[in-house]
């Protein structure tokens, strides 16, 4: 369909055409070395539960604020993400949202952005990359959970020292949040179990996050963190402005 073609062309424009120049520019700023740690099934399960909790809570906040902004603007609230995926074939959702998107976004936001900013410390790098990851989605309803997931994915990247962890997690999050509902029948026990899994995983994720907050490992970088250095430059300013403009256009 036309919507599917537009979606795929947008992905090609955002990822395939944008990544090579980004890699070329970032070569002048090598990423500092990171400690390598094993990615175990237990660790993946823990991060998955925490991620689902962040997605659900962030989605509730984002959807409420999105509806409020639409009503203030005198418009009928619209969920652009749900409407878009409802119009796409399952094959396009699997290819775009569950494979191509996670790989390219992790290369860009974690591998390039967070990895290079880690010279100012891993925690500031995670915050900045998560902020841009949230803004990049260019809509209010997705910003909060995208920002929260960006923090988790950056932590997984820094903790393991490999992009394999954030890429796999990103694929799982997108598959569970976007594709599973398209695979389920419209009636029966499976949709009920799927819906029930969200609050159950959210409770488990919050417990794991609270219990593990003091065991978090963030390395310091060789350079002092500087808001002026990170944000007060043409590239960062342009990226933030473009994201805000894209978001604002939804309400016109």
Residue ranges and their predicted role:
Residues 1-26, 192-200:
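Alpha-helical transmembrane segments in multi-pass membrane proteins
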Residues 1-9, 71, 180-189:
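Juxtamembrane/transmembrane-helix boundary motifs at the membrane-water interface
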Residues 2-3, 31-107, 114-118, 250-252:
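Juxtamembrane helix-loop-helix connectors linking adjacent transmembrane helices
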Residues 16-30, 64-68, 202-218:
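Membrane-water interface of transmembrane alpha-helices
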Residues 17-25, 54-69, 156-160, 176, ...:
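Alpha-helical membrane-inserting segments
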Residues 22-43, 129-132, 180:
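Cytoplasmic juxtamembrane interface segments
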Residues 91-251:
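Transmembrane helix-loop-helix hairpins at the membrane interface
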């Amino acid at each position: 369909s036309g919507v599917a073609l537009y979606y795929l062309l947008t992905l090609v424009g955002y990822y395939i055409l944008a990544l090579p120049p980004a890699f070329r520019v970032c070569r002048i700023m090598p990423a500092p070395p990171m400690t390598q740690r094993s990615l175990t099934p237990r660790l993946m399960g823990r991060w998955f539960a925490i991620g689902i909790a962040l997605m659900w809570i962030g989605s509730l906040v984002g959807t409420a604020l999105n509806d409020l902004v639409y009503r203030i603007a005198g418009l009928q609230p619209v969920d652009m993400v749900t409407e878009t995926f409802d119009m796409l074939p399952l094959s396009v959702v699997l290819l775009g949202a569950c494979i191509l998107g996670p790989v390219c976004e992790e290369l860009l936001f974690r591998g390039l952005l967070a990895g290079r900013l880690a010279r100012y410390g891993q925690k500031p790098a995670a915050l900045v990359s998560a902020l841009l990851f949230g803004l990049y989605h260019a809509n209010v309803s997705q910003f909060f959970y995208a920002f929260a997931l960006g923090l988790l994915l950056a932590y997984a990247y820094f903790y393991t020292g490999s992009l394999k962890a954030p890429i796999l997690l990103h694929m799982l999050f997108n598959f569970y949040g976007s594709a599973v509902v398209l695979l389920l029948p419209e009636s029966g026990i499976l949709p009920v179990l799927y819906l029930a899994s969200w609050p159950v995983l959210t409770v488990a994720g919050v417990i794991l996050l609270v219990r593990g907050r003091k065991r978090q490992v963030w390395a310091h970088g060789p350079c002092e963190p500087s808001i002026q250095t990170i944000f007060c430059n043409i590239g960062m300013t342009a990226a933030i402005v473009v994201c805000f403009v894209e978001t604002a256009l939804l309400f016109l």
